[in-house]
Regions:
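Catalytic Walker B motif of ABC-type/P-loop ATPase nucleotide-binding domains
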Residues: 153-157
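ABC transporter nucleotide-binding domain
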Residues: 171-248
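Hydrophobic anchor residue at the start of the ABC signature
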Residues: 142
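Walker A (P-loop) phosphate-binding loop of ABC-type ATPase nucleotide-binding domains
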Residues: 35-39
């Protein structure tokens, strides 16, 4: 469904994305894990066609994003980290506007009602978006991504800034959408991706450093402990002391 081959993005002498390749199968929920600045959002923006790559290709359901941008983009629903909402509109008016902007070729009223039902915002249809909680605004963002029934959903940090209950609700929503869509979800939090995704790619400094099923990756990191210490003294003495610790 999604195929990325030898993707590279340079900003001057900096490689934001460094020759990465991966595929995502139909109906798969893929987690894209890495710290801030690792290259996650850059990769997402290339996949969705928002920016071009320096080299490499992205193919969405058989359509290459640069050669067939219109056809490829029509197969993608994108939810950026900050949803593109017009907060002075009502939920319904906003979705009608986005429906027209995307030139969706489906019955307008019925399709918008179905999308609102899927993300559970039907009762919020006539409310002004700026008066909604962050959790409901995120659901409106999901609704706009679903307009047109795209087979692929790209979700960039979809739970960032939400409270614990809202996070649980969004996780459930993503899992339910995964039954009918291929999903790529980015996050810098392993527990967040582990709770939602079938498979995890780990990216660091623009390179993929791990690719595994969620349970396999969770098992490989289980039992590891991290300890943060604050030490005082000469740097040379501290380094010497650390080197004398077994297994360090």
């Amino acid at each position: 469904m999604v195929e990325v081959k030898k993707l590279t993005k340079n900003y001057g002498n900096i490689k934001a994305v460094d020759n990465i390749s991966f595929t995502v199968g139909e109906g798969e929920i893929l987690g894209f894990l890495g710290p801030n600045g690792a290259g996650k959002s850059t990769t997402m923006n290339i996949i969705t066609g928002y920016i071009s790559s320096t080299s490499g290709t992205v193919t969405i359901d058989g359509k290459e994003i640069l050669e067939n941008p219109k056809e490829a983009k029509a197969k993608i629903g994108y939810l950026p980290e900050i949803p593109p909402l017009y907060t002075d509109m009502t939920v319904k008016k906003y979705l009608e506007f986005m429906f027209d902007l995307k030139k969706v070729k489906l019955p307008k009223k019925e399709h918008i009602e179905e999308v609102m039902r899927l993300v559970r915002i039907t009762e919020q249809a006539d409310r002004i978006i700026k008066n909604l909680s962050k959790g409901y605004r995120q659901r409106v963002g999901f609704a706009q991504a679903l307009l047109g029934n795209p087979p692929v959903l790209i979700l960039d940090e979809p739970t960032v800034g939400l409270d614990p209950m809202q996070i649980i609700e969004i996780r459930k929503l993503i899992k339910s959408l995964g039954k009918k869509h291929t999903i790529i979800l980015s996050s810098h939090v392993l527990s967040e991706i582990s709770a939602t995704c079938d498979r995890i790619l780990v990216i660091s400094n623009g390179k993929i450093v791990a690719d595994a099923k969620t349970d396999e990756l969770s098992s490989s990191t289980a039992g590891e402990e991290k300890l943060a210490l604050v030490v005082e003294g000469a740097a040379s003495d501290i380094i010497s002391a650390i080197k004398n610790i077994p297994a360090v």
